């Protein structure tokens, strides 16, 4: 069984990780965020599998709840920022596909134009 002090320390570490991930999302450091997300998920899994001792008093329980609430608030903010980033990337992909289509159409037109500019077989004999 884990001590109340150790449990509080683990919850505070989880909060620290969630704050770090939120900061990374705000600053657009997506690669680093993904790396930290792995550590974060492992920390959450560790806490999920850690039973809360019965001898923890109501003040400590309240403190743990407050920490968890802040962690969940941070997760909601990160989720919003990730959705915004996904929308941006989706827009960029759409623009890229349009540009590719335009380039392909232009290439076809340019190829046909060259054929139109080629001299006719009768014109080469004169």
UniProtKB/Swiss-Prot annotation:
Tell me the InterPro entries matching this sequence. Answer: FliT (IPR008622)
Question: Region Required for homodimerization: start and end of each range?
Answer: 1-50
Tell me where in or outside the cell this protein is found: Cytoplasm, Cytosol
Instruction: Locate the region FliD binding.
Output: 60-98
One GO cellular-component annotation of the UniProt record comes to: cytosol
Q: Name one GO biological process term.
A: bacterial-type flagellum organization
Cytoplasm found in the keyword field = yes
What's the chief localization of this chain?
Answer: cytoplasm
Task: Note whether Secreted occurs among the keywords.
Answer: no
Signal peptide interval: none
Please describe the quaternary structure of this protein. Answer: Homodimer. Interacts with FliD and FlhC.
Job of this protein: Dual-function protein that regulates the transcription of class 2 flagellar operons and that also acts as an export chaperone for the filament-capping protein FliD. As a transcriptional regulator, acts as an anti-FlhDC factor; it directly binds FlhC, thus inhibiting the binding of the FlhC/FlhD complex to class 2 promoters, resulting in decreased expression of class 2 flagellar operons. As a chaperone, effects FliD transition to the membrane by preventing its premature polymerization, and by directing it to the export apparatus.
Protein name, UniProt field? Flagellar protein FliT
Q: Which organism is it from?
A: Pectobacterium atrosepticum (strain SCRI 1043 / ATCC BAA-672)
């Amino acid at each position: 069984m884990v001590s109340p002090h150790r449990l509080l320390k683990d919850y505070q570490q989880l909060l620290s990780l969630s704050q770090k991930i939120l900061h990374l999302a705000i600053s657009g450091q997506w690669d680093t965020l993904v790396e930290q997300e792995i550590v974060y998920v492992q920390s959450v899994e560790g806490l999920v599998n850690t039973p809360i001792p019965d001898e923890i008093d109501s003040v400590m329980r309240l403190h743990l709840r407050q920490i968890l609430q802040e962690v969940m608030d941070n997760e909601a903010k990160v989720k919003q920022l990730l959705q915004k980033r996904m929308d941006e990337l989706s827009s960029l992909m759409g623009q890229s596909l349009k540009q590719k289509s335009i380039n392909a159409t232009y290439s076809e037109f340019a190829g046909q134009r060259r054929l139109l500019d080629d001299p006719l077989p009768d014109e080469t004999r004169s």
